[in-house]
């Protein structure tokens, strides 16, 4: 039985040797043929040469190198495209997702699950801000989007070959893999685990990238941000109508003069701000449509070696 590990890497020269050694020395994976698909996402350090060297000595290492940095989501998709295992497991190279969890994922899969989620029961290794923003994102996403995504589940999971083939059929260029992996469906099971500290290096995923990923997740699986502006428009129009009616009554019945420029200026600025926000939301969706219709590839591979080059 063949198990494929899909491992996106970006400037991870310190972590790759530790990860490889840990996988190959882990006794509970010895009964399986374990393929490791490294996807080098445009690294500037020695990452590419390290994974190519591993492939020379180990035919079960598949090194893929992008021509530039395309991002983690395209890297994951490339890994799924090139993984050949009966089951495929995306996993981070930093070993925060422990190798020891993999046998439990395999056990659930062999019991009949199409997808086995690895759920973090403890995120104390993440900073407080990251934990809170992740909690807010999951709650917001699951309120307004379909399908819902399991809270505290990242990319670390096991997928059957059938699920992987279904994912590969999806044509979109704007990728939010957590949503895509949930969208394909199938019988799902969960394994809980405690997230560990990084074995080497530092995280390359900063706050700005997390913000963009959150936007991608919401705009890829929900039209609520567009629909909400209909309700905002109705609300503003209703308030404006009531305020206008009150001004007429106040003038005709009570004889008070019409208020001057301050109220007019505030109204114009308020409506202008509302319109700009609405245009911004609309622009986010139009921009994604623009990217999709150009039909560019999700990624471009510079080098691919299986075994000896």
From Swiss-Prot:
Belongs to the glycosyltransferase 2 family. GtrB subfamily. It holds the Pfam family Glycos_transf_2. This is SfII prophage-derived bactoprenol glucosyl transferase. Involved in O antigen modification. Catalyzes the transfer of the glucose residue from UDP-glucose to a lipid carrier. The chain crosses the membrane at residues 229-249, 263-283. Keywords: Cell membrane, Glycosyltransferase, Membrane, Transferase, Transmembrane, Transmembrane helix. Disulfide bonds: none annotated. It is a multi-pass membrane protein. InterPro entries: Glyco_trans_2-like, Glycosyltransferase_2, Nucleotide-diphossugar_trans. CDD domains: DPM1_like_bac. It is an enzyme of class 2 (transferase). GO terms for molecular function: glycosyltransferase activity. GO terms for cellular component: plasma membrane. PANTHER family: PROPHAGE BACTOPRENOL GLUCOSYL TRANSFERASE HOMOLOG, UNDECAPRENYL-PHOSPHATE 4-DEOXY-4-FORMAMIDO-L-ARABINOSE TRANSFERASE-RELATED. It is found in: Cell membrane. Its EC number is 2.4.1.-. It comes from the Bacteria.
